[in-house]
């Protein structure tokens, strides 16, 4: 599992060298409004765009199971990637509920907060991360995990799940990659 979410800078290199064209043009003004530097996570990226990037990088999106194991950081039966104490969330996660006590209005640069027990950053908060899996048996929506800056601490729970259609892009959706086959 990559230690960091894919950044804007990394995604731009992919676009330039691969020639990949998303179905709809990327709204870079929107991207930079919420994620203002090349070191911030790439947002407004669909599951299709995330998958294309991963393939270009010789990687893939994590399965939901892989994502959850990695997010737990070695903990078992704990609510969050850092344990059970929600009051520590500000040290590990960028989310809506910091009471203005963090430095970021929206996304934080990747790796700005403490890593989990496996040395992985931003496994809780910052941006929801696309996973390989379908959400449910109807195969209409893809899984997103991890919570985001837009949601409260409840979204930071390791077991929290979200979903959306694979062509959807939002200002709080991003991704990270994993090496190897599933």
Where are the regions a protein language model picked out?
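A short glycine-rich, aromatic-capped structural motif
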Residues: 1-28, 44-48, 125
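Functional-site microenvironments in short loops/helix caps that host divalent-cation chemistry
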Residues: 27-162, 166-171, 178
């Amino acid at each position: 599992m990559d230690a960091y979410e894919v950044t804007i800078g990394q995604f731009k290199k992919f676009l330039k060298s691969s020639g990949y064209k998303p179905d709809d043009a990327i709204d870079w003004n929107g991207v930079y409004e919420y994620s203002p530097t090349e070191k911030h996570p790439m947002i407004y990226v669909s599951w299709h765009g995330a998958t294309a990037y991963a393939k270009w990088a010789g990687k893939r999106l994590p399965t939901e199971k892989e994502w959850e194991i990695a997010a737990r950081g070695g903990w078992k039966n704990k609510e969050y990637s850092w344990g059970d104490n929600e009051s520590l969330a500000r040290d590990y996660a960028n989310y809506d509920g910091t009471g203005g006590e963090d430095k970021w209005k929206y996304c934080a640069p990747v790796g700005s907060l403490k890593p989990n027990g496996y040395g992985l950053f931003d496994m809780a908060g910052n941006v929801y991360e696309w996973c390989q899996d379908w959400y449910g048996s109807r195969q209409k929506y893809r899984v997103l995990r991890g919570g985001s800056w837009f949601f409260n601490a409840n979204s930071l729970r390791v077991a929290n799940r979200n979903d959306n259609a694979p062509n959807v892009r939002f200002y709080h959706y991003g991704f990270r990659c994993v090496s190897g086959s599933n």
